[in-house]
Amino acid sequence: MTTAGIDLQLGFETALQNLGLSPGAAHALWVPLPMLLMVIAATLGVMVMTWLERKISAAAQQRIGPNMAGPQGVLIPIADGIKLLTKEDVLPSLADPVLFTLGPILVFLPVFLCYLVVPFGQNLLISNIAIGVFFLIATSSVQPIGLLMSGYGSNNKYSLLGGLRAAAQSISYELPLALSVLAVVLMSNGLDTVGIVEQQSGLGILSWNVWRQPIGFVIFLISALAETERIPFDLPEAEEELVAGYQTEYSGMKFALFYLGSYANLLLASLIAAVLYLGGWSFVVPVETIAAWLGIPLDNPFLQIGAAVLGILMTMVKAFIFVFLAILLRWTLPRVRIDQLLDLGWKFLLPVSFVNLLLTAALKLAFPTFFGG
């Protein structure tokens, strides 16, 4: 069922028009708001993730974790932010000022731009474009340039090695990740992120793509971990080898951009996994079935609003399951070597993702009803 949902742009522009503004003026006032909403939502998500990482890491090591800044340490992300904002922004004497400054921006900006096309609920997304998946892949591919610029512009051998590792790792795993996503696109017959979720909403949990794309799902998770530089793929900033990798010479707000970009990238990958494979805002049981159990008509406004609100929570719960797993893996798996990492990407994941794509195409021709023909 397609619920009425929440259309932020339509609601905002309609409210302004009711106050007497022309449609053009109302639309002009809306244009800067998506970027602001995107930054606020992603920043809040990063704050929650940093607190979760500290508490889960503490539990894994039988520690208490942060407990001084607010109840259960919930204000520790704000304290971290204030600390980073007040630190001096140092420019090394031998660093290239242009590359050194642009690097963090090119690492941070593409991640936040990707949030423009990620649906958090029915009609609750900032920009619903027909090529949403293509936009995600194309925008995220800019990040390796920023990593290289940061490593090279620092004029530090550890930073350079970290930047080269990060770029090689990102490029190696972008291909299998893109091919695994392409298999989902093939089944949904479109690049629209909202359409992909709606294609999974027919039979509840049985309609989710994870059952039809188990191989692609595993490839996506492994590639996403490598793209976000999480353990066991955190080679670009391996402390024992490279101090802090391409971040070695950074401090203050520039370092904060790397910090924000890293966690925002993990949350983005988790949201994309929830949207592509776990049905996004779709419920485990279809809304029609729930309405029949409760004896409520489908056009009931309370059902519409409740389904929309709970759908947003459903998307976030699914996404934070992946965040939780990524944090647990940090204390479970050892770091791999650089040759093992590249071999896994080029010699195993890439061929398997090609086979998975061809298999999906064949199954779509053979079983069009089940595979989205």
Swiss-Prot record:
It comes from Synechococcus sp. (strain JA-3-3Ab). NDH-1 is composed of at least 11 different subunits. Its EC number is 7.1.1.-. It is found in: Cellular thylakoid membrane. GO terms for molecular function: NADH dehydrogenase activity; oxidoreductase activity, acting on NAD(P)H, quinone or similar compound as acceptor; quinone binding. It catalyses: a plastoquinone + NADH + (n+1) H(+)(in) = a plastoquinol + NAD(+) + n H(+)(out); a plastoquinone + NADPH + (n+1) H(+)(in) = a plastoquinol + NADP(+) + n H(+)(out). This is NAD(P)H-quinone oxidoreductase subunit 1. Keywords: Membrane, NAD, NADP, Plastoquinone, Quinone, Thylakoid, Translocase, Transmembrane, Transmembrane helix. The chain crosses the membrane at residues 29-49, 64-84, 98-118, 129-149, 177-197, 202-222, 267-287, 309-329, 348-368. Disulfide bonds: none annotated. Belongs to the complex I subunit 1 family. InterPro entries: NADH_UbQ_OxRdtase_su1/FPO, NADH_UbQ_OxRdtase_su1_CS. It comes from the Bacteria. One of its GO terms (biological process) is aerobic respiration. NDH-1 shuttles electrons from an unknown electron donor, via FMN and iron-sulfur (Fe-S) centers, to quinones in the respiratory and/or the photosynthetic chain. The immediate electron acceptor for the enzyme in this species is believed to be plastoquinone. Couples the redox reaction to proton translocation, and thus conserves the redox energy in a proton gradient. It holds the Pfam family NADHdh. The keyword Thylakoid applies. GO terms for cellular component: plasma membrane-derived thylakoid membrane. It is a multi-pass membrane protein.
